[in-house]
Amino acid sequence: MNGDFPESVWIMFQMTFAIITPALIVGAFVERIKFTAVMLFSGLWLIVVYCPVCYRVWGGGWLAEAGVIDFAGGIVVHATAGASALTLAWMLGRRSGFPRNLKPPHSPGMVMMGAGMLWVGWFGFNAGSAAAANGDA
């Protein structure tokens, strides 16, 4: 951080990473566990997996000192979420009734709106990671 914006803004930006990362994992166990279990898993996962990896990779951690470069969460967000989702999907097994009871998409317009929001949001993640809106972002 270069000091051009308040520390609270940086904290809120980092919280967006912490919030979205467990949401990436949820797709691996959708329709197989209860919502309360998802909330409990998300909190525990943030403490046990996400925070230690952030500490080691970002902000001058020992992996950063060893030369690991993680721009916009490639390791901290995507690798940890992907490995966790794969592990959970393997542990939970197949969904019951899938693929016999497929439901067609109900609103292509809403799908496009969601894709647009995701696109703009991820651009914000990249710009925020560079702490600038320039060619680095």
Language model region names:
Residues 1-137:
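Hydrophobic alpha-helical transmembrane bundles of multi-pass membrane proteins
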